[in-house]
């Protein structure tokens, strides 16, 4: 999956960059794309002499806010359709350049070594689970997807005291990796960056799609 994501990103970045026609390409991208984009950045520059690429990572909702406030951005890559739809409604992007370039999977994770491993989503109600990392639903797509999953399971209200809000999906990942929480909601691609340190408890059937577009800047 990681190789496919990188290949898709490289191809999409090249296509969008051609449309943007910038010597210094500033890309605002969802936090879950951090590792993939940092890896392909040098490859892109090698294939496009004279073009320097700079990345700005964060929660998709925050990236749209930054763009609305005048941030100098050439390409916008979000982790959900809603954020890109918002950017389009605010005429912040060139709609004819919009493409869906990748997908992902929302997962529930925990530390690989734990005394009482979780087996399923409902186990989050157990007393042993005191803190659960989740992206802020208002600005973090992964958090919004997680809320939908919890609401569908009838767990959202009951788990409120345990939820630890994260500014982006990578912060939620870090909370789990550092042992500051017992579980967290992230994307499968994020969990994969931690090797065998973390364990995927459950995958969820949520349509996670990544759109990209050239901005109007």
Regions found by a protein language model. Name each.
Residues 1-6:
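Positively charged n-region of N-terminal signal peptides that target proteins for export
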Residues 22-48, 52-57, 61, 65-69, ...:
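Exported/periplasmic ABC-transporter solute-binding proteins
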Residues 7-17:
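Bacterial N-terminal signal peptides
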């Amino acid at each position: 999956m990681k190789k496919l994501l990188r290949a898709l990103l490289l191809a999409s970045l090249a296509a969008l960059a051609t449309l943007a026609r910038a010597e210094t390409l500033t890309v605002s991208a969802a936090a879950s794309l951090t590792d993939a984009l940092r890896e392909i950045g040098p490859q892109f520059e090698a294939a496009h002499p004279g073009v320097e690429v700079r990345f700005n990572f964060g929660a998709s909702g925050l990236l749209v806010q930054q763009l609305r406030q005048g941030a100098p951005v050439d390409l916008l890559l979000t982790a959900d359709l809603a954020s890109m739809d918002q950017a389009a409604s605010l005429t912040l992007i060139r709609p004819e350049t919009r493409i869906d370039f990748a997908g992902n999977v929302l997962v529930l994770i925990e530390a690989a070594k734990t005394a009482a491993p979780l087996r399923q989503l409902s186990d989050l109600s157990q007393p042993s689970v005191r803190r659960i990392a989740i992206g802020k639903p208002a600005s973090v797509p992964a958090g919004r997807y997680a809320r939908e999953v919890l609401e569908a399971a009838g767990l959202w209200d009951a788990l409120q005291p345990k939820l630890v809000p994260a500014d982006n999906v990578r912060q939620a990942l870090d909370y789990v990796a550092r042992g500051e929480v017992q579980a967290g909601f992230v994307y499968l691609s994020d969990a994969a960056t931690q090797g065998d340190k973390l364990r995927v408890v459950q995958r969820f059937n949520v349509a996670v799609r990544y759109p990209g577009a050239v901005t109007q800047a």
